[in-house]
């Protein structure tokens, strides 16, 4: 459908007296915003929500007592108390803020023999760059200077210049533990970020509360102007879709009846439809695993971008890491903590052969997504676990409330009887077979 523009420009005519002009203008009917159809509303809402989720995260981060822009926060190592923890890396994070005259500088230490990356994302969740040995083989460490778009500000000699998509960016760093947590933490603390001056930093715009359990209603359109003005979007459909957002914002503001109509469509059709897409269709379902292999850079697909921001904000690109999420067994039945299962990797398709860095698999309970306590304090396996292979060179991982007959206990990942669970398989530095969707972890097969 065609949506009206936001305003009508009336050019004064010198030859007409003010009184006559007033009469003429009084006879022109006022423009009324058109009611959108469901598809147009869905497109605009999902697009706007994507930026809203990123703003929500900035507000959450900025509320921390020690928060400052251009200062790294060194996260403590993941523990069993975290939600869906990554027990394989030491994390660091920051918000970068620059202006035309003021770059920010990142110092990356020399790291050898273990995986690391510094992921830089824009304010919509698009990955700008990863800084590591793979992406900067001639300079994997040293000084990296972040500058605003179009900025000609000088940077230190020898620094690598990286142009951001806007005046802010999110930084997420990861350093592989590799069986040496103390060494990883020592390296983590050597990453440093600082501004080259005092940049002008705009606070994140005010937005209505966004709850994942009950997504925001039409009130998000009341904030459309500040939300869209707060960050440049590289999506090729941005200009077109933002016009749809503005038109619907005008319609919502036109009266209580219009707002009620939009809220009804959101509640009954748009939000349920989007959640169904995000949870079941936003990523491929291969070999009974949900595969997050198309994230990080989304092109025109802002629906996939918003899904990623909702389900796990700041997703990385598949060339860096691919996640497989398992919620169902080989019969497509929900994974049950009371049952026993086996994952059987063929000898010619072992997980370590599919990655350039490392792999891991972790079990968490559902719906709390926390690791399952057990007497072995065993929550995950990875490249460095002492897994015993089969005589033919294949490898089995057993899953269940007790060891599985025929599988070494060293290969047993405990579950909690009576509770459903989820598996997350992470492949860091995935090789071509994973990226090309030719390899997935084996299906989680029930033991009869």
Q: Which role does the model predict for each range below?
A:
Residues 14-27:
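Bacterial N-terminal signal peptides
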Residues 33-448:
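A compositional/structural signature for long, glycine/proline-rich flexible linkers
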Residues 1-11:
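N-terminal secretory signal peptides that target proteins for export/translocation
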Residues 28-32:
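Sec/Tat signal peptide C-region and signal peptidase I cleavage site
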């Amino acid at each position: 459908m065609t949506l009206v523009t936001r305003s009508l420009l009336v050019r004064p005519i010198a030859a007409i007296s003010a009184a006559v002009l007033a009469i003429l203008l009084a006879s022109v009917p006022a423009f009324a915003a058109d009611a959108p159809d469901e598809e147009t509303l869905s497109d605009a809402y999902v697009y706007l929500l994507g930026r809203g989720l990123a703003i929500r995260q900035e507000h959450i981060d900025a509320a921390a007592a020690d928060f400052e822009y251009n200062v790294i926060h060194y996260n403590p190592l993941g523990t069993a108390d975290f939600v869906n923890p990554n027990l394989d890396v030491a994390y660091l994070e920051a918000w970068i803020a620059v202006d035309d005259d003021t770059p920010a500088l990142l110092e990356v230490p020399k790291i050898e023999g273990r995986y690391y990356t510094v992921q830089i994302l824009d304010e919509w969740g698009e990955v700008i760059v990863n800084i590591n040995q793979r992406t900067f083989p001639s300079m994997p460490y040293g000084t990296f200077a972040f500058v605003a778009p179009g900025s000609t500000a000088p940077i230190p000699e020898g620094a690598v210049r990286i142009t951001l998509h806007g005046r802010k960016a999110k930084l997420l760093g990861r350093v592989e533990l590799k069986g040496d947590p103390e060494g990883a933490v020592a390296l983590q603390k050597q990453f440093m970020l600082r501004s080259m001056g005092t940049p002008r930093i705009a606070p994140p715009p005010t937005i209505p509360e966004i709850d994942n359990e009950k997504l925001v209603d039409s009130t998000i359109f009341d904030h459309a102007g500040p939300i869209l003005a707060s960050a440049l979007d590289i999506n090729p459909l941005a200009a077109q879709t933002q016009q749809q957002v503005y038109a619907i914002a005008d319609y919502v503001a036109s009266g209580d009846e219009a707002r009620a109509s939009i809220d009804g469509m959101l509640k009954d059709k748009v939000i349920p439809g989007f959640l169904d897409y995000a949870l079941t269709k936003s990523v491929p379902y291969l070999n009974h695993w949900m595969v997050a292999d198309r994230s990080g850079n989304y092109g025109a697909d802002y629906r996939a971008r918003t899904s990623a921001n909702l389900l796990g904000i700041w997703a990385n690109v598949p060339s860096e890491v691919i996640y497989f999420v398992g919620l169902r067994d080989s019969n497509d039945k929900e994974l049950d903590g009371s049952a026993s299962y086996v994952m059987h990797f063929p000898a010619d398709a072992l997980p370590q052969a599919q990655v350039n860095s490392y792999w891991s698999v972790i079990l968490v309970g559902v719906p709390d997504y926390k690791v399952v306590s057990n007497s072995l304090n065993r929550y995950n396996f990875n490249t460095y676990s002492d897994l015993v292979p089969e005589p033919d060179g294949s490898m089995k991982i057993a899953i269940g409330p007790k060891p599985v007959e025929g599988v070494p206990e060293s290969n047993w990942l405990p579950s909690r009887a009576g509770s459903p669970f989820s598996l997350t398989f992470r492949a860091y530095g995935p090789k071509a077979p994973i990226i090309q969707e030719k390899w997935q972890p084996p299906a989680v097969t029930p033991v009869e």
